[in-house]
UniProtKB/Swiss-Prot annotation:
Disulfide bonds: none annotated. Pfam families: Ribosomal_S8 (PF00410). GO terms for molecular function: rRNA binding; structural constituent of ribosome. It comes from the Bacteria. It comes from Edwardsiella ictaluri (strain 93-146). Belongs to the universal ribosomal protein uS8 family. InterPro entries: Ribosomal_uS8, Ribosomal_uS8_CS, Ribosomal_uS8_sf. HAMAP family: Ribosomal_uS8_B. This is Small ribosomal subunit protein uS8. The keyword Ligase does not apply. Keywords: Ribonucleoprotein, Ribosomal protein, RNA-binding, rRNA-binding. GO terms for biological process: translation.
Length: 130
């Protein structure tokens, strides 16, 4: 059986991995997943990530903890295959009054809501991370 929403699966693996105090989580890799992992690393939500394998690449995320508690408090899928959510540059949401981030897929690539606002771009709201 094929996976219906690979991005939701990625977010769930991160959520479950941190709930179980895992050091790292692995998942099948894709360009979008790598772009999301890059944004999470830049914003300090994960420690690091790497891609292994050639035929079927596997993405490994090294999770981040602060004083024994997970850095990611909540991670939530917004736009999903059955209901895509697009926002213009002035409609981009502020997550937890600016404490969290919205991961946005724009015409210039995957970035945070802040970066999209500065670049004057709108796009698909992939997920919220706080």
């Amino acid at each position: 059986m094929s996976m219906q929403d690979p991005i939701a699966d990625m977010l769930t693996r991160i959520r479950n991995g941190q709930a179980a105090n895992k050091v790292a989580v692995t998942m099948p890799s894709s360009k979008l997943k790598v772009a999301i992992a890059n944004v999470l690393k830049e914003e300090g939500f994960i420690e690091d990530f790497k891609i292994e394998g050639d035929a079927k690449p596997v993405l490994e995320l090294v999770l981040k903890y602060f004083q024994g508690k997970p850095v990611v408090e909540s991670i939530q899928r917004i736009s999903r295959p059955g209901l895509r959510i697009y926002k213009k540059k002035d409609e981009l949401p502020k997550v937890m009054a600016g404490l969290g981030i919205a991961v946005v897929s724009t015409s210039k690539g995957v970035m945070t809501d802040r970066a999209a606002r500065q670049a004057g771009l709108g796009g698909e709201i992939i997920c919220y991370v706080a």
